[in-house]
């Protein structure tokens, strides 16, 4: 490859001695000649009596004579018969905003020029050759020129990258390579054989002009988008093309969009798919090293004719509800009935591999609201106890502050557990836990939810302070813990009913008090499960979820509200896990461990999403997500960039809701236990920097060390989801890879691409139970 690049560069130098420059000034044309006003345009070749134009989109401040930027040449679709050079204009503007130089090339078509597909491919190769020949004047890297296109334009691009021949001998710079360095193909008609597209027009030489019949190891990295209901390009054709490329070692990415027809990527057909394909194209080019930094969602939003809708968001998060406590997630080993949660799952999407940011309360809530792991703060283990300054820094954006800035009303009804300070109602002095087991009525809090983006707060700090009811910034009354769950239901319903009286979108975050201790089911729920008080409490929690969903629906919000249901971590040992197991109920389902642990039962959580008429009913996603991803998902939903120095560990799972793959440069997900032990999940593999559970389940770390258990654990979650077989000694290379990635993500201050960030502390210790010898 290096030799090819040198030859290309050498040939370009020669070209400037033998070919006239076309770029001193854009060619002057009449308004009737110009397809895209106010954009530099040149003629890249003359053919059939026509000057074929190429339009150039440059990044702001581009200095062609001193820069070399990645480039792409796009070709419009239209069955080789017609089409508009403007088809990819918005793609060009977006990629130019990301630092690329983009070209939209006209080429000969049957309707206008009376030509055949051969001429289309010839012109495509000529356009790429022209860009490469003039690279130094255009400010283009000659070794980073992509070709892209839709339908027949996708064929032109693919043929330029894959098929030999079809060179125009009249090109003055014929010695310059016309082969692109990457392909960006939107439902391309790239199989032209007897069962493919356009066979009747290329019948005599289809083996030469059909990209699908010419795949070799020299082909460029390829990105393909296709709708599952495309009548011109069967999904099986795209899958075979993808497989054939990968078989010869070519990087290939295929994205199939369920239910979408040919041309679905155009904004006029589907604004959502238009946006998603551009973001996936951004990700693909980033993976090649052509783009840097996160995508520009805000700029992309500005390009849209119709701005994204602003649906309401209702997030219900249970406290200490195990994955196996939801009956539909654990039908064979779950004995607790949860009909309302089950109905929610049936009405939307179930994520089967969702994880809380931590195996315990406070860190998960911090990560959910900030999109950043809590161990990046001073809190390295355990939870906060209240009567102290808020864990969220004053200047740190939260999900609530972001949505509030976008015009949302924001409310938190339930448990905070991120610290706030109580001030004496008479003296204004800060109260402390030692002298006040319960803050008095009238006590003020100035650093609670309202200081971090919420308009309204009704709830409590955590279980020890549950009797102190706070509304907005004051303790308003004392009440028994048994009334808390019904109170939160009533307050949530009241808020939804009030929201129905205006058209302002709202974000309602409902972190419930249950089924965490104190386990206090109301009198009417006692004994209903026939299992235990904990099971009764779970059933009451399910009923509250049903009440909230009913309020959403009866107040007219069913279709424009996203409802998310989850838990902050696994089931607590306070539920009497062994007793439940004896009665046939497994709180973590098939998974090992429970709350506080690094094993799956500590942090694999229920995650259900209902978005009526958008998310498919009874659908599933096995993509791995984390509750820290909530922030980025909302910015993606509104097509906004993540604020600077925010959401450093957050990746949007919005594509998954559309049955698409999540795009991210984040390599894996970081787990942490109550004691601060780390774990790292990357694809099928999970590494634990702990000898035992890292939490409350036996063997705990002390006992595990006495038993001389290995310093780390490695599991293949595909073949061993129950974490029964530690294969760390057999796959030390894989353990080393995950450990290196974990260290990188910790040290970088972020696990995603974006503005350079830093941890709040240097006291992060990776090996809390001692490193292995030799260390990974």
Can you name each region flagged by the protein language model?
Residues 25-67, 486:
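N-terminal cap/lid segment of alpha/beta-hydrolase-fold proteins
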Residues 55, 235, 239-303:
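C-terminal catalytic histidine-bearing segment of alpha/beta-hydrolase fold enzymes
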Residues 67-78, 314:
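Short beta-strand element of the alpha/beta-hydrolase
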Residues 85-104, 336-345:
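Short amphipathic alpha-helix adjacent to the substrate-entry channel of hydrolases
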Residues 115-136, 277-280, 391-397:
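Alpha/beta-hydrolase active-site loop
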Residues 126-202, 206-207, 211, 438-439:
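Primarily recognizes the serine-hydrolase "nucleophile elbow" in alpha/beta-hydrolase
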Residues 224-226, 230:
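Short beta-strand/loop motif that positions the catalytic acidic residue
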Residues 239, 248, 275-276, 286, ...:
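Formylglycine-dependent sulfatase
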């Amino acid at each position: 490859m290096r030799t090819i690049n040198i030859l290309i560069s050498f040939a370009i130098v020669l070209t400037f001695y033998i070919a006239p420059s076309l770029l001193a000034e854009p060619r002057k044309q009449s308004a009737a000649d110009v397809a895209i006003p106010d954009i530099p345009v040149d003629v890249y070749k003359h053919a059939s009596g026509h000057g074929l134009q190429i339009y150039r989109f440059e990044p702001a401040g581009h200095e062609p004579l001193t820069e070399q930027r990645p480039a792409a040449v796009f070709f419009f679709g239209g069955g080789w018969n017609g089409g508009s050079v403007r088809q990819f204009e918005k793609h060009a503007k977006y990629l130019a905003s990301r630092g690329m130089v983009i070209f939209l090339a006209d080429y000969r078509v049957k309707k206008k020029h009376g030509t055949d597909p051969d001429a289309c491919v010839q012109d495509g190769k000529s356009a790429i050759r022209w860009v490469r020949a003039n690279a130094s004047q255009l400010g283009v890297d000659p070794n980073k020129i992509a070709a892209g296109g839709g339908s027949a334009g996708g064929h032109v691009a693919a043929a330029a990258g894959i098929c030999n021949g079809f060179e125009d001998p009249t090109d003055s710079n014929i010695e310059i390579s016309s082969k692109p360095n990457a392909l960006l193909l939107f439902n391309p008609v790239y199989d032209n054989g007897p069962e493919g597209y356009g066979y009747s027009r290329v019948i005599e030489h289809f083996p030469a002009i059909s990209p699908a019949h010419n795949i070799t190891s020299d082909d460029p990295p390829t990105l393909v988008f296709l709708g599952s209901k495309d009548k011109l390009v069967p999904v099986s054709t795209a899958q075979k093309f993808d497989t054939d490329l990968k078989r010869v070692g070519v990087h290939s990415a295929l994205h199939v969009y369920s239910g979408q027809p040919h041309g679905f990527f155009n904004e006029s057909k589907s604004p959502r798919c238009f946006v998603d394909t551009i973001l996936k194209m951004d990700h693909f080019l980033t993976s090649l090293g052509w783009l840097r930094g996160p995508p520009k969602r805000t700029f992309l939003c500005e390009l849209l004719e119709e701005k994204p809708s602003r649906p309401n968001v209702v997030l219900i998060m249970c406290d200490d509800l195990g994955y196996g406590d939801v009956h539909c997630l654990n039908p064979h080993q779950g004995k607790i009935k949860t009909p309302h949660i089950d109905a929610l799952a049936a009405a939307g999407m179930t994520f089967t591999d969702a994880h809380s940011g931590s195996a315990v309360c406070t860190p998960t809530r911090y990560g959910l609201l900030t999109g950043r792991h809590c161990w990046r703060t001073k809190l390295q283990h355990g939870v906060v106890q209240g009567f102290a300054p808020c864990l969220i820094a004053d200047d740190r954006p939260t999900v609530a502050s972001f949505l509030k800035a976008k015009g949302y009303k924001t409310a938190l009804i339930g448990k905070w557990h991120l610290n706030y300070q109580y001030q004496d109602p008479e003296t204004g002095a800060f109260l402390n836990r030692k002298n006040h087991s319960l803050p008095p009525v009238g006590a003020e809090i100035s650093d609670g939810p309202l200081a971090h983006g919420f308009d309204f707060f009704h709830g409590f700090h955590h279980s020890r302070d549950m009797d102190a009811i706070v509304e907005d910034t004051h303790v308003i009354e004392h009440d028994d813990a048994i009334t808390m769950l019904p109170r939160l239901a009533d307050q949530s319903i009241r808020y939804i009913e009030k929201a129905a009286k205006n058209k302002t979108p709202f974000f309602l975050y409902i972190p419930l008090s249950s089924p965490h201790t104190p386990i206090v089911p109301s009198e009417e729920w006692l004994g209903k499960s026939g299992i235990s008080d904990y099971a009764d409490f779970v059933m009451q929690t399910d009923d509250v979820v049903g009440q909230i969903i009913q309020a959403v629906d009866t107040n007219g919000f069913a279709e424009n509200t996203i409802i998310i249901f989850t838990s902050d971590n696994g089931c607590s040992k306070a539920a009497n896990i062994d007793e439940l197991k004896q009665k046939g109920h497994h709180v973590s389902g098939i998974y090992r461990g429970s709350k506080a642990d690094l094993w799956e039962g500590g942090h694999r959580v229920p995650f259900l999403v209902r978005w009526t008429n958008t998310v498919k009913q009874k659908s599933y996603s096995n993509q791995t997500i984390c509750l820290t991803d909530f922030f980025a998902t909302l910015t993606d939903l509104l097509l906004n960039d993540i604020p600077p120095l925010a959401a450093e560990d957050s990746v949007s799972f919005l594509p998954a809701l559309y049955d698409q793959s999540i795009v991210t440069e984040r390599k894996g997900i970081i787990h942490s236990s109550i004691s601060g032990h780390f774990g790292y999940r990357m694809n099928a593999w999970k590494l634990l920097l702990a000898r035992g559970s890292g939490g409350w389940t036996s063997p705990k770390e002390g006992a595990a060390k006495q038993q001389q258990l290995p310093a780390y654990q490695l599991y293949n979650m595909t073949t061993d989801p129950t974490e029964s077989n530690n294969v760390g000694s057999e796959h030390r290379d894989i353990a080393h890879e995950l450990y290196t990635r974990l260290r990188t993500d910790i040290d970088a201050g972020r696990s995603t691409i974006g503005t350079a960030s830093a941890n709040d502390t240097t006291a992060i210790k990776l090996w809390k139970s001692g490193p292995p010898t030799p260390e990974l």
